[in-house]
Each structure stands twice: as structure tokens, then as C-alpha cells.
């Protein structure tokens, strides 16, 4: 499957440009105002473009760049975005912080861990794409870019 097939499969708008890059290559190909997202975020994490409100606001508030995130983070945030859309719950990124702690795994990136063993999100997305963690897409175009495009230390006020 090429980039056009990938865009069709994940319902990425035609005005969004994707450029495939293996691990390491994106550092030299990324331009200003472009963002790098691991392909696994779409495949296992349910990442969508344009980003959902919860996903976008969580990344901005925590100053986390999309390529620093493990698929789990996108999976949880995307699940809440979907719940809001389908059930009109009105949850915000503050609710995510209340229920989850953000942790860093050196090789995987930032992930969310539930603060409570009694309450967890049920996540039904696939986890069968071993070897894809080193594949990235550079995203540009008109996709409502509202997240960091330059890597910074997480936390604090953006």
C-alpha cells in the first residue's frame, strides 16, 4: 500500500500532504510548520487528521510533539474524542489528566497509565503491527495544525 492508499484507509483529507520517512530520515526532510507522526499512531493508535479536540488540546497543554507519543497515548485520547462525538459527553483533556498519568518510556515515548484500577478505557484497536514503530510520515498542508511543530521539553505553559 502506498501513501495514497494509506490516506484513503485512514480517511486523511486530500488537502493534507503525507511524506513517508523511515526512522532517522525525517530529521533531514522535515520543514518548518510540518509535523512528524509515527505511522503506528494511525494503525494502532487510532490517530485521525484533523486531530480531535481532546488529542490536540492534550498535546498542546503538555507540550508534547506527536512523534514523542506511544500509540497508547493516541489510543486513549482518540477513544475519548470518539466518546465525545458519539455520546456528547463533553469530556476535556482535564478529564484525561484526572484519570491518567503521563509516563515516558525511553524507546516508546510518552504513554498514559490509568490512576485507578477500577476505571479504565476499553480500547479495541489492533496491536499487530510489529516493526512499524520506525516508520514515520511528515504531515503538511491544510489539516488545522494546532500542535507543536518544534520539539520542546514537555510540561509547563506553551
Which residues does each PLM region occupy?
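Residue-register detector that marks a fixed positional context within folded domains
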Residues: 1-158
